[in-house]
Amino acid sequence: MEVLKAILYGIIEGITEWLPVSSTAHLILLHEWLKFDLTPEKEEAFMELFNVVIQLGAILAFVIIDWKNLWPFGLAGKKESTKKTKKTKNGVSADPRWSFGALAVKQNSIFLWIKIAIACIPGFLYGILLDDTVETYTDAYKTTIIGIMLILVGLVFLLVEHRIKVKEKKPKVKLLTELSWQTALIIGLAQVIAAALPGTSRSGATIIAGLLLGLSRPVAVRFTFDLAVPTMAGASLLKLLKYIKNGLVLSGGELTILIVSSVTAFLVSFIAISLMIIYISRNKDFKPFGIYRILLGAGVLLYYLVIAG
């Protein structure tokens, strides 16, 4: 039974990690209705660890899919074209290289990682300095905060898309190579809001920030996905260290839950990522996600504040 629960958690994570609907909110809500068979003294600490570590499986799927753009090294072969960068639908461009003997270094990948590192600075500082303090205040009202943030961010998505349509604003940044370090830093600050307030959605916050800063939808999504790699890896490491520091040790059953959930999230993510990239590349907007968030948030508030009271 625990394995089946772990598979369900993995499916939910694999789908929602790549949509701006807050995967953490979905996992927390699922845990409210479908709990693992854990001892009371370990349940809270384990689920806090679980909700972060399970995301590593999903992130690994994206690393494999986008490996060619993320990995900056290769073998020097034919001379790379130095002509003007070619624009593509999904925000990826031609990649000139530096050659060092037999080693070739892709310029765009190096510059992308520099911008990712800059965007990670706010989240790193938050995780080290404020994470525990903020969690102390938000834990008691977690489901209420989730409901409110699902609705608020959903409304922001609708407003941003309406603004783009009414003003017929064309994106200023249509390629990842055109993304400035200042823009990357602001997007990184948006991540902190998501880290502090459950239900915000890390991808939702960064995509909204990107759209407001003039990024095209494909570029906003691509950078959001790229940024998830070090962000979630770092968050998982931080949670694991805290778990160990508190003297807790994973049992065989808990380790099985983590592995099964992560592997499931990994497999499901291949489908979810591909569908999301196809959806955005066809110039579709984020209104459906905004509407979904509002409906889910309203349902959460109705249940926990009125029905469950």
Predicted regions and their residues:
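Multi-pass membrane proteins that catalyze or facilitate reactions on polyprenyl-/lipid-phosphate substrates
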Residues: 1-309
